[in-house]
């Protein structure tokens, strides 16, 4: 199971978390184990209310609302093999 974004300590997040059903543990992907917001053109911005789909060893993330509650219309791909984000234009 994967979760992206949401609220952390009252602020919107751009963390991607994976839950392992076998070990019943969470892992933050692409950032190590820190909970902090990273702003970069190479990863999605902080958001809530986005949609996600897992397909062919990748996670696709679409839309949501950003830190200013503006609607987002962007599409991102997270490659599970390389732990890298790529924006899809």
Predicted ranges, named:
Residues 1-89:
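Kelch-like beta-propeller repeat domains
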């Amino acid at each position: 199971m994967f979760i992206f974004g949401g609220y952390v300590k009252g602020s919107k997040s751009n963390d991607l978390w994976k839950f392992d059903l076998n070990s019943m543990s969470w892992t933050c992907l692409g950032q190590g184990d820190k909970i902090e917001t990273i702003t970069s053109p190479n990863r999605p911005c902080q958001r809530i209310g986005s949609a996600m789909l897992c397909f062919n060893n990748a996670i696709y993330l679409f839309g949501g609302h950003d830190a200013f509650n503006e609607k987002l219309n962007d599409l991102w791909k997270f490659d599970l093999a390389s732990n890298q984000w790529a924006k899809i234009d």
